[in-house]
Amino acid sequence: MDPPAVGEAVKRVIVALDPARRGDVDRLLDMARLVCGVGAGIKVGLPMLALGGSEALAEAARLCKGGGLRVLDLKLADIGYIMRLAAESLSRGFDAAIAHAFVGYEGGLVELKKTLDGLGARLVLVVSMSHPGSREVLDPCLDKLLAVARRVEPWGVVAPATRPEVVARVRETLPTTVILSPGVGAQGGKPGDAICLGGADYEIVGRMVAGSPDPVSALRGVAEYIAARCPEKLLHSSTGNGPS
């Protein structure tokens, strides 16, 4: 049995399953079945759609049903009508879908939010990204993007594990909104940076787990690292925001 802090930490790790080639699709779908019963859930997006089609997205959602959060990451960024069509076609079976906050409210995110509400899914808005280029455009506009998020009232927002100071700023502005933080591992963020230093609810880990020959052990290793950094914080806080 995991120590209490590790048991809490593993429930804060979402595994990103992004195939690099067509041959990876089946392997990552098999992995979905394994990690969904251990971690917080999975995130799939454009690589899975491009290489496996909408059927692969639906299969990932099916395999993880009842095993954690199922996050669809298409980073939607269009007028409301187009985002609504995409959500109606691809979001069924997922607990949450990601879109860009910069689209704005009127004629955009308000329509997507209404569509997702009708599908029983939650909206997650990107307010900052994990790559260095986010500093060029998104981060200078962070206050405006957070204002959009306050107006839209999404379930969650995306903020980068690679810059925990941004996560902390988002947490200060949106104290009750779920924060999902990508960029752990290959992009340079250390496990626990976003949760322990920034106040994120979830960290998203991709290649560090998905590229391992033993993904469950790799996932537990990430959780152990997080737990060692801030056990008290983990034990005295709970996301309470899993799928209903």
Swiss-Prot record:
InterPro entries given for it? Aldolase_TIM, OMPdecase, OMPdecase_arc, OMPdeCOase_dom, RibuloseP-bd_barrel
Cystines in this chain? none
- Identify which residues the record assigns to the active site: 75
Which reaction(s) does its UniProt entry say it catalyses? Answer: orotidine 5'-phosphate + H(+) = UMP + CO2
- GO MF entries: orotidine-5'-phosphate decarboxylase activity
Q: Which residues form a coiled coil?
A: none
GO cellular component terms, semicolon-separated: cytosol
Keyword Lyase attached? yes
**Gene3D superfamilies xrefs:** Aldolase class I
Q: What does the UniProt keyword field contain?
A: Decarboxylase, Lyase, Pyrimidine biosynthesis
Q: In which pathway does it act?
A: Pyrimidine metabolism; UMP biosynthesis via de novo pathway; UMP from orotate: step 2/2
This enzyme's EC code(s):
4.1.1.23
Q: What class of enzyme is it?
A: lyase
| Binding-site positions, substrate | 18, 43, 73-82, 130, 182-192, 206-207
Q: Which SUPFAM superfamilies match?
A: Ribulose-phoshate binding barrel
Q: Name one GO biological process term.
A: 'de novo' pyrimidine nucleobase biosynthetic process
Subunit composition and interactions: Homodimer.
The entry sums up its family as follows: Belongs to the OMP decarboxylase family. Type 1 subfamily.
Purpose? Catalyzes the decarboxylation of orotidine 5'-monophosphate (OMP) to uridine 5'-monophosphate (UMP).
What protein am I looking at? Orotidine 5'-phosphate decarboxylase
Provide the organism lineage as a comma list: Archaea, Thermoproteota, Thermoprotei, Desulfurococcales, Desulfurococcaceae
